[in-house]
Amino acid sequence: LHGSSAASDVYKRQAFMLLGFLGLYYRGNKTFSIPELIELGTSGAFTGTFATLVFAVLFLGFAVKVPMWPLHTWLPDAHTAAPTVGSVLLAAILLKLGSYGFVRIAIPILPEQAKAWAPAIAILSAIGIIYGSLACLAQTDLKRLIAFSSVGHMGFVMLGIASLTPI
């Protein structure tokens, strides 16, 4: 996986997420404090094209981490290349960090953009559920099967997040 184009694509998408955080930093009183950024976001400090662009790049970065369809392409190769313990940790813990980013960062800081993007996130999640489940049926390698089942089960998580109901 090291040096592969899939890994390179993941790094590029993560760089976009970094740009989103830098935009929030410079527009939000030069702070990375999540509570302060949430307060600024809910008070209307982040609006218009800026807010939409920041939500888009945060979405892109977190969606790769989830992994959300169609940004999941790195996952089967990562599971296959990883030792079994690494594959289990990837499926059990690390994939949840993207959804945590949505719940704790993107949605609270940019709630209006989250509402606007929720239908698209729900559609992509539903496609991911179906795609991941069907791809599981075609797998003969257990690690790839776990990877595609992770795409499906994280689709359910993201579908719940897209509903924007209080936790």
Q: Could you describe each region identified by the protein language model?
A:
Residues 89, 122, 146-147:
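Hydrophobic/aromatic positions within or immediately flanking transmembrane alpha-helices
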Residues 66-80, 130-149:
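C-terminal ends of transmembrane helices
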Residues 47-52, 128, 146, 153-156:
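Aromatic-enriched alpha-helical transmembrane segments of multi-pass intramembrane proteins
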Residues 15-72, 77, 102-120, 163-167:
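Juxtamembrane/interfacial segments at transmembrane-helix boundaries in multi-pass membrane proteins
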